[in-house]
Amino acid sequence: MTVIYQTTITRIGASAIDALSDQMLITFREGAPADLEEYCFIHCHGELKGALHPGLQFSLGQHRYPVTAVGSVAEDNLRELGHVTLRFDGLNEAEFPGTVHVAGPVPDDIAPGSVLKFESVKE
């Protein structure tokens, strides 16, 4: 597999876990404005080395998910801001421009040190 993007969660905002109950995980790179940081999983920003598209594999810690849809600005947001909203609903069409949809259950064991990646499943 080819890694397209990899980063490590460094902090978890006080309200970030609440979004998981709505099947949503919101990330932002370190240095996010304080009012946003409260709702985000903060990470040390990695380099985006390819395009985000359906068919990639998203992983968080030991959990693996197929990417089913990518919003029109999700790739730019990730590249520039380290920001992406992940939805664990398996939709085949992005609900919002900044959203990446994946299929599978919401992870319940996210902690600082968890590695987040997007990988190509084809060589």
From Swiss-Prot:
Keywords: Cytoplasm, Kinase, Phosphoprotein, Phosphotransferase system, Sugar transport, Transferase, Transport
Upregulating conditions: Regulated by an unusual system which consists of the activator GutM and the repressor GutR in addition to the cAMP-CRP complex.
GO cellular component: cytoplasm; transmembrane transporter complex
Outcome after substituting I17T: In strain: ECOR 6, ECOR 28, ECOR 35, ECOR 37, ECOR 51, ECOR 58, ECOR 61, ECOR 66 and ECOR 69
InterPro entries, per the entry: PTS_IIA_glucitol/sorbitol-sp, PTS_IIA_glucitol/sorbitol_sf, PTS_IIA_glucitol/sorbitol_sub
UniProt entry tagged with the keyword Cytoplasm: yes
UniProt cross-references to SUPFAM superfamilies, sorted A to Z: PTSIIA/GutA-like (SSF141530)
GO biological process: phosphoenolpyruvate-dependent sugar phosphotransferase system; sorbitol transmembrane transport
GO molecular function annotation: kinase activity; phosphotransferase activity, alcohol group as acceptor; protein-N(PI)-phosphohistidine-sugar phosphotransferase activity
Modified positions (Phosphohistidine) in chain numbering: H43
Main location (coarse class): cytoplasm
Alphabetized Pfam families for the sequence: PTSIIA_gutA
Disulfide bonds: none
Stated role: The phosphoenolpyruvate-dependent sugar phosphotransferase system (sugar PTS), a major carbohydrate active transport system, catalyzes the phosphorylation of incoming sugar substrates concomitantly with their translocation across the cell membrane. The enzyme II complex composed of SrlA, SrlB and SrlE is involved in glucitol/sorbitol transport. It can also use D-mannitol.
Stored PANTHER family: PTS SYSTEM GLUCITOL/SORBITOL-SPECIFIC EIIA COMPONENT, PTS SYSTEM GLUCITOL_SORBITOL-SPECIFIC EIIA COMPONENT
Protein name, as recorded: PTS system glucitol/sorbitol-specific EIIA component
Species this protein is from: Escherichia coli (strain K12)
Name of the gene: srlB
